[in-house]
Amino acid sequence: QTPESFFSRFHVNMKVRHEVTAIHPEKKEVTVKNLETGEEFEESYDKLILSPGAKPTQPRLPGVGLDKLFTLRTVEDTFCIKDYINANHPKSAVLAGGGFIGLELAENLRELGMDVTIVQRPKQLMNPFDADMASFIHNEMRKHGVKLALGHTVEGFEERDGGVDVL
């Protein structure tokens, strides 16, 4: 998703690299700072929903700091991954995690022609779903060429022959 595609799809004006620095409930406004320019401005709201986000889980595993490994949580993370793919043209990717974000990334990487494997500790994708729904998702992913390694854990990463082995 880009801010433009998010707006065209949902009519939501997404501001990337901006931070809310103050909330003014009496005026129904927030103070926003552009992290690239330092400019601050006021933005009004009807209802304010606080969604501070989360940091992706990144376990302490051997090799986790390799430059060919990425976490995906923000639009900026997407840009980093896209830039890497455009510059290096990898043929395959292993995704650790089979939730909403992992499945969406798998779909996008397959559309780019990459071989994709999802490694997931639980024995099903989309853990919150029941087994029947998960089974449908498994079949769809396999039908579209995504390999599934369910019930497996990632133990670490090792750089080899210009790529990364997932242990």
Model-derived features: positions:
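FAD-binding core/adjacent interface of flavoenzyme oxidoreductases
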Residues: P3-A93, D165-L167
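Residues that line or immediately flank small-molecule/substrate-binding pockets and catalytic motifs
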Residues: P52, G97, D161
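Residues within well-ordered alpha-helices
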Residues: T2-P3, L105, I137
